[in-house]
């Protein structure tokens, strides 16, 4: 059967593809060239199949997802569990990092999806705001036995005299804080910079400096009396988390949907300690392009 097909090809192409002798067959130059072209065509077909298959929400062979460390502290465990349950054979990879690194990996195709701080100057064509969190002043507790006062507040003007440890200037959280401080004519004292989330918290625990983070990412430490938190008011300071998909590699629609659903599922965890409902910006009603200005307005109205 195979020999007949090869002879039909030779007849159609008008060139021998195999040199036949008593010891067997050897490919001619034309045969070698046809083999190379055929392999290229097969790879292209397989690539096309994979790209189309990625469009099915029920199929996921691999996923690389990036997010800031303070987001992964809340989202990663339930998200990883949900993805593993839904896609038992999928290769799952998670990456912590700052905005700049996550965005570079996203643009390079190393990540399928990333959760980013919607910071000033961030450039990506398909950012979608999915969550807004109020930031707190996070400090080491004077005594380990001190009861957690999760309702404590601090006015923005009082931050001026407090030494802070913050991420470097290329980090999205730092850009959000700097933009907020500039808008409100606040002069913050940055004692040192730490791009590593764990290193930043080590500085805080030493008592050398405080930091600005969502209380939710440190819930266990706050309730145990290791850290204390004070909600920043007059005006409030929010960070917005946005979802962005890669433009250079296929993105499974079902993956994006699952991430959004999981954020909704753990929304209360992200917003701990709960703020009154009327103080929480309605993310669903705000377009990404106008989100920052809307939050600025909310700062003045709420506090």
Walk through the language-model features, giving the residues of each.
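Residues within the DNA-recognition helix of helix-turn-helix
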Residues: 4-5, 79
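A short LG(V/I)-centered, amphipathic sequence patch enriched
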Residues: 8-27
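Alpha-helical linker/hinge and terminal dimerization helices associated
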Residues: 12-13, 34-56, 269
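Central regulatory/effector-binding core of bacterial HTH transcription factors
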Residues: 60-122, 194, 301
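A late-sequence structural motif
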Residues: 75, 228-282
